[in-house]
Design a protein with these regions (language model features):
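Perimembrane topogenic segments of multi-pass inner/organellar membrane proteins
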Residues: 1-35
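Membrane-embedded alpha-helical bundles of multi-pass integral membrane proteins
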Residues: 11-15, 21-22, 37-193
Length: 193
């Protein structure tokens, strides 16, 4: 039952909340899609944190999407141990860069008084949720090696089943709890946006 809730109900619920909430926000408060600009209040930490965060996370998300869309090619790519090791090291490095950038952005929001003055509780909730998700990804990369390979045989078929509106939570059942939490956390982030 829990597997059905976590891997069949929550994903659809998260997407529904994101779509309906997005429409509602657009109609009621169009400026709620981003936090207030704080660039003029402090720009040095913003630059280093923002660049690190965006470059790191966009590359990591790109790899997740490429493996999801081109799963056969991805499986072939990581079947070679040298390429697998290389991708794993690059992925871990990028996730650390993203995490450090996000940590800098969070610290900036909390420490710089002028920036803290325009920080909303939702800004902090979102930043902490993002940091948690990246930290879980780092934990998985360090503790459950070769995610580039097993992702394509577990999470990808599960995500494909969701897209086909025929959820198959059994693909996720055998995965470690931390991986399950990372997968559910991804959908909770979708709901937050």
């Amino acid at each position: 039952m829990w597997n059905t809730i976590l891997f069949a109900v929550i994903p659809y619920l998260a997407v529904a909340i994101a779509v309906l909430g997005g429409i509602w926000r657009y109609r009621t408060d169009r400026f709620s899609y981003s936090s207030q600009s704080s660039q003029f209040l402090e720009s040095r930490a913003l630059f280093w944190g923002s660049v690190s965060w965006h470059y790191g996370i966009l590359m990591i998300l790109g790899a997740h999407v490429v493996a999801l869309v081109l799963w056969n090619q991805w499986a072939s790519l990581v079947s070679n141990p040298t390429r697998l090791y290389t991708l794993e090291v690059i992925g871990l490095a990028l996730s650390l860069v993203a995490f450090l950038g996000l940590a800098l952005l969070i610290a900036r929001r909390l420490i710089v008084r002028r920036v803290a003055a325009v920080t909303t509780p939702m800004d902090l909730v979102l930043l902490i949720a993002l940091a948690t998700q990246v930290a879980l990804g780092i934990w998985i990369a360090l503790g459950y090696r070769w995610g580039s390979e097993w992702y394509v045989h577990t999470a990808v078929p599960w995500l494909h089943s969701l897209v086909k509106l025929n959820p198959k939570p059994e693909y996720m059942v055998s995965l470690p709890a931390i991986v399950k939490l990372h997968a559910v956390g991804g959908f909770l982030l979708i709901a937050l946006f």
